Curated annotation (Swiss-Prot):
GO terms for molecular function: cyclohexanone monooxygenase activity; FAD binding; NADP binding. Keywords: FAD, Flavoprotein, Monooxygenase, NADP, Oxidoreductase. It comes from the Bacteria. The keyword Cytoplasm does not apply. Gene3D superfamilies: FAD/NAD(P)-binding domain. GO terms for biological process: defense response to bacterium; phenazine biosynthetic process. The lineage of its organism: Bacteria, Pseudomonadati, Pseudomonadota, Gammaproteobacteria, Lysobacterales. FAD binds at D39, T47, W48, Y49, W50, D59, T60, Y65, I112. InterPro entries: FAD-binding_Monooxygenases, FAD/NAD-bd_sf, FAD/NAD-binding_dom. Its cofactor is FAD. Involved in the biosynthesis of phenazine natural products including myxin, an N(5),N(10)-dioxide phenazine antiobiotic, which has antimicrobial activity. Catalyzes the aromatic N-oxidations of phenazines, such as 1,6-dihydroxyphenazine (DHP), 1,6-dihydroxyphenazine N(5)-oxide (DHPO) and 1-hydroxy-6-methoxyphenazine to produce DHPO, iodinin (1,6-dihydroxyphenazine N(5),N(10)-dioxide) and 1-hydroxy-6-methoxyphenazine N(10)-oxide, respectively. Also catalyzes the N-oxidation of 8-hydroxyquinoline, but not 6-hydroxyquinoline (6-HQ), quinoline, quinoxaline, quinine and 2-phenylpyridine. This is Phenazine N-monooxygenase PhzNO1.
Length: 541
């Protein structure tokens, strides 16, 4: 006999990273609902649980890569470095869980295989990887933007006698000491791993798929005075973050690059190069790096000049210089280009010399050279946004799967709901704000909580968005993206890191402040674009 007290909930949350932890707290502790959160991992942390690779750390500053809702934990947490590393990040998130007593309502080592909406009883039925069944009135997906790893298909994988790993599924006991290591990928993760691995491996071979614009991170230990200043100005700092575009805690420039002299531009670029941070360099130098070709060219030329200045071997420097626009997600780490001056580091440019196959001993490139390896690391990223959902079978009205609903491209209304899937919400769903993630997560969690709280007060069992609202939001996001330079470069932020997949808009590029204003506008209009009703058989408008 099923014990409904243990298997039925007001809400179920999938995921226990930044989004899932706060969502559980919001629904349980603030709204008083009966909630259970599930995670396939054996600990909380989401992407920060899985990404244990050497060098793993945030590339947004520590004081803003955290919650603002939990001032007490932040004030009691004296971080050591400008950028929090993976172990410290897990410690912080666990401290939040402990402070708010959330552990008793988190079920770990339990993935969700399916979620099906029952139109008669208007509840979600979930099947877990452990064979259990649970039901809930509300389903909140907090599964993350970057969860499902991507490993490119390379001939000969079954021949390789060494070890193959992905940075997003790093074994805790894996050491690089004394090993010949190869790495494919030079994105945000790749540059961090390369710099760390160069200090540990006997030899490191970097297989570069595309050259990367990388600025220094300015990583360093922070002083007690630095931490104290943040704590003393907590509210003011967070007010500025919420009312900014990128939400990274620095002053975003309002000056056009071409409105100043060449001498002044170089001074500004040099100043921000010395301070460090990728988002700061793109958005703190000038206001139009991401939208104006001339401004973008100026920034690109500056970084390319730095590469040629830093890298001693001219041929290596040539390979490291990007030839496209500076319009991918900004990347930063300390000493990236300096790493290629080390005697134990070599670079292979895959556009010029592709991988032919893996052999028993390593990687064979088209020039006939066999690069002998003990370990091959894929820093090749994730299936952005939709990958997390593709790992589950989610069925809404009429039995339609989410995969079918998103067959052309993932879409949503405001990044939080999709038509035909009543009482299902998403944190960081498709076309959420392109910004520092924790402030964006908080904005959505708080808004979803307000919507559910409002519906509970109205005794309304069903909340769903309309197709018209979803289509209009998708069109808005496409229009804003087209105004920027980002779509002009092949990148994971448009899902183009998946073989055979065409470009699709996955983010709202209008800034966090603009996004929050839209959320407030919709709420103030009695949640315009949503239908709240008691008839579960009602058709979506």
């Amino acid at each position: 006999m099923i014990d409904n007290d243990k298997t039925h909930f007001d809400a179920i949350v999938i995921g226990t990273g930044f989004a899932g932890i706060y969502m559980l707290h919001k629904l349980r502790n603030e709204l008083g609902l009966k909630v259970r959160a599930f995670d396939k991992a054996s600990g909380v942390g989401g992407t920060w649980y899985w990404n244990k690779y050497p060098g793993a750390r945030a590339d947004t500053e520590s004081f803003v890569y955290r919650y603002s809702f939990d001032k007490e934990t932040s004030e009691g947490w004296d971080w050591r470095n400008r950028y929090v590393d993976q172990p410290e990040m897990l410690g912080y998130l666990q401290a939040v869980v402990d402070r708010h007593g959330l552990a008793k309502d988190i079920q770990l080592k339990t993935g969700i295989d399916s979620a099906v909406f029952d139109e008669i009883h208007h509840i979600w039925t979930l099947t877990t990887s452990t064979g259990e069944l649970f039901t809930a009135r509300y389903l909140v997906n907090a599964v993350g933007v970057l969860s499902k790893i991507v490993i490119p298909q390379i001939p000969g994988r079954d021949k390789f006698q060494g070890q193959i790993v992905h940075t997003g599924a790093w074994p805790a006991d894996l050491s690089l000491e004394g090993k010949r290591v190869g790495v494919i990928g030079t994105g945000s993760t790749g540059v961090q791993f390369i710099c760390a691995a160069s200090k540990l491996a006997r030899h490191l071979t970097v297989f570069q798929r595309s050259a990367q614009f990388c600025v220094p991170a300015g990583s360093r230990q922070v002083s007690e005075a630095y931490v104290a200043e943040y704590k003393n100005n907590f509210e003011q700092i967070w007010d500025g973050i919420r009312n900014s575009r990128i939400a990274c805690g620095f002053e975003e420039s309002g000056v056009s690059a071409m409105s100043v002299s060449e001498e002044e531009r170089q001074k500004v670029f040099e100043h921000h190069w010395e301070i460090g941070n990728g988002f700061r360099f793109m958005f703190g130098t000038f206001s139009d790096i991401a939208v104006d070709p001339a401004a973008n060219q100026a920034a690109s030329d500056f970084i390319r000049a730095k590469i040629r200045q830093i890298v001693k071997d001219p041929e290596t420097a040539r390979k490291l210089c990007p030839t496209d626009l500076y319009a991918k997600r900004p990347v930063c780490t300390n000493d990236y280009y300096e790493t290629y001056n080390l005697p134990n580091v070599s670079l292979v440019s895959l556009p010029e010399n592709p991988i032919k196959e893996l052999t028993a001993n390593g990687v064979l490139t088209e020039d006939g050279v066999e690069h002998k390896l003990d370990l091959l690391v894929f820093a090749t990223g994730f299936e952005t946004v939709e990958g997390s959902y593709n790992q589950m079978e989610i069925r809404g009205r009429g039995g339609e799967t989410l995969q079918h609903h998103w067959k052309d491209a993932p879409s949503s209304y405001l990044g939080v709901a999709t038509a035909g899937f009543p009482n299902m919400f998403m944190v960081l769903g498709p076309n959420s704000a392109f910004s520092n993630l924790p402030p964006s997560i908080e904005s959505q969690v708080e808004w979803i909580g307000e919507l559910i709280g409002w519906a509970e007060g109205e005794s309304t069992p069903v909340i769903e968005t309309t197709r018209e609202a979803e289509e209009a939001w998708t069109a808005t996001c496409k229009e804003i993206a087209a105004y920027t330079l980002f779509p002009k470069v092949k990148s994971w932020i448009f899902g183009e890191n998946i073989d055979g997949r065409s470009s699709r808009v996955l983010f709202y590029f209008g800034g966090l402040a603009g996004y929050r204003a839209k959320l407030r506008e919709v709420a103030d209009a009695d949640y315009e674009g949503f239908i709240l009703h008691s008839d579960p058989s009602s058709m979506v408008a």
